């Protein structure tokens, strides 16, 4: 059983973040299904009623910041989707934190920081360690 209900990241600029995530989520089959003044919501095409990823203004009214030591791992269907996500992210202003490739554990993944510096790990289905 998957224990995660959804992921939420903070942003001070929903227009820029929406443009970024609209583009990078396309290879993962996630689309924006909600937009309010407070947040954007993204769902997978297989279950468009279930929002899995939110972009929000912080509820405390302070500036959005990234979490030091925090990482969000997203699962792609295959290597091609990992590469496409990474390429789109970089073209939309993300920071490279490790290009896609086979790692020491034998798995294929890469890392970017989004426009608000949240660390995103994009991976194909992994093998056990």
Please describe what each predicted stretch is.
Residues 120-129:
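Single conserved hydrophobic/aromatic residue that forms the stacking wall/gate
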Residues 11-16, 74-115:
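Vicinal oxygen chelate
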Residues 8-52:
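Core segments of cupin and vicinal oxygen chelate
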């Amino acid at each position: 059983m998957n224990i995660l209900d959804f992921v939420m990241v903070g942003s001070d600029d929903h227009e820029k973040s929406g443009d970024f995530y609209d583009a990078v989520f396309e290879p993962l089959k996630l689309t924006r299904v909600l937009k309010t003044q407070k947040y954007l919501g993204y769902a997978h095409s297989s279950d468009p009623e279930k929002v899995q990823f939110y972009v929000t203004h912080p509820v405390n009214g302070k500036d959005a910041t990234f979490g030091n030591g925090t990482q969000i791992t997203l699962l792609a269907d295959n290597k091609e989707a990992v590469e496409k996500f990474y390429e789109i992210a970089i073209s939309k202003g993300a920071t490279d934190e490790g290009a896609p490739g086979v790692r020491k554990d034998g798995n294929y993944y890469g890392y970017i920081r989004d426009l608000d510096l949240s660390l995103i790990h994009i991976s194909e289905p992994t093998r056990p360690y």
